[in-house]
Amino acid sequence: MAIRLIAIDIDGTLLDSRGQVPEGNQRAIAAAVERGVEVALVTGRRYTFALPVAERLPVPLTMIVNNGALVRTKQGETFARQLLPRESARRVLGATADFRMGALLLFDRPKENQILYESLDWNNPSRTDYWRRNREYLTQITPLEAGLTEDPIQVMYTGGVAEMRRLGERLAGLEFANEYAVQMTEYEAKNFTLLDVLHAEVSKGAALRHWAERRGYAASEVMAIGDNFNDREMLDFAGVAVVMGNSVAEMRSDGRHVTGTNDEGGVGQAIERFALRET
């Protein structure tokens, strides 16, 4: 069956290691859209951080952001939004007080007070980079719970890989773990992990499934391309699941199709192979 919807992760997938969109990716995406294929960017990034990437692609597309919590167009029209109940966020923060140094609250707001933090240790170079790229959105508040005046999109933690795995294990074992979902994005080479605590029903896969149903596409007509653990659910849903050559090793050993690395234009290669080939 022909591919009618292509879901593409951003970091480590669409973008190369310099943060650019390789020309081969741009050409393949444009060719797919010209054939009537719909494209969705599906990312852990929040909307305002993903939008500049979307705007580099001069084609209509849907943005599934915050690991599936929000679905929006480039023009800002919202199709779906699932927020983390503030009381669940409060309970999570209370149960992870010893990880407070790397904790953030993210809200669906304009620039001001979009990201709240209590205290951050900037010794990790990746965390310093996060600060540099997001400083205009960051506001300090003590205690962090005081910022829960409305439901957040998520509670986000940043830290080393081993530290965040320990946190993930703790969150999985809490008695109220059914109140939230946990998504992890690991960068082992940088020893840096983003751990997101979201609404219990949120994942890239769930959002992609709902969007495909809304658009009238069967799973067999959906292609997904990703590289990290937070892409697993959408890869499991898609009829054609493709992992990047630079993906986490565990992702490449699950019997999925493997394309080139993000520096080799692996997204474009996959689209050429599975969506643009003549049948």
Predicted feature residues:
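Mg2+-dependent phosphoryl-transfer enzymes with acidic/Ser/Thr/Gly-rich catalytic loops
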Residues: 1-5, 21-22, 194-279
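Active-site phosphate-binding/coordination module
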Residues: 20-128
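Residue-level signal for inorganic ion chemistry
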Residues: 32, 43, 67, 155, ...
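Short active-site oxyanion
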Residues: 36-40, 59-61, 153-154, 220-221, ...
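Short, structured coil segments at secondary-structure junctions
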Residues: 57-59, 67, 176-178, 237-238, ...
